[in-house]
């Protein structure tokens, strides 16, 4: 994938970049793997706002992705590589030998015609999925399960990858993209390779309207709100926040304040904490 730059024909175009979509082979998704996707606008079933900065955006259909990769022993072949509006990574349509079709996350380097396989006996090849116990130390992986059979939950964004560091009893040590080293059950599955579309992070949105197309609403500073809307609000003119430390809209300390529970059940699985950014 390459980044496409634009001439500054307007203020919105100046500095704007997009993907050239060179890896995409079709713009028509597989109809049998589409599901309706209803917009919530960040509201829950009571109509109350639970997630800020969401609303509007282009209409989408959900692509049903196979995160479990549990079709063991049946070879499949990549039919298309497609754009997915619901995630940063591209997706690949797999045609299996028994006639079934499934979408998977498209790893870096995958092409139309590539053969893939799932299961303990699969080769260590990009796109294949195996239990962690069967993956050699040093292998780069993505789409990692946390519970056997639940489906991949970690390392699914564009350009991300993890690495198998070692094996201890029924656990496998994996270094995640954040630098965190975590123990994961050896029966959990992972896919070989790095997630594709790795230059996604280099894209410059360019203008506010492009964020609105994505369904992202503006983020307003608390200091320009009224006191009943935010702890930083109020005052005459450009007033300071009037607090010892920055606060969230709900009055909790923020910007550097640690929010992780002191006694989290998953602490025993974390060998090394993530790197400070």
From Swiss-Prot:
Task: Spell out the GO cellular component terms annotated for this protein, sorted alphabetically and separated by semicolons.
Answer: large ribosomal subunit
Q: What biological-process terms (Gene Ontology) are attached?
A: cytoplasmic translation
Coiled-coil zones:
none
Which residue stretches belong to region Disordered? 219-277
User: Record's superkingdom?
Assistant: Bacteria
What's a single GO MF annotation on this record?
transferase activity
* Keyword field: Ribonucleoprotein, Ribosomal protein, RNA-binding, rRNA-binding
- State the oligomer form and interacting partners: Part of the 50S ribosomal subunit. Forms a bridge to the 30S subunit in the 70S ribosome.
**What is the name listed in the Swiss-Prot or TrEMBL entry for this protein?**
Large ribosomal subunit protein uL2
* Organism, scientific name: Bacillus subtilis (strain 168)
Record gene name: rplB
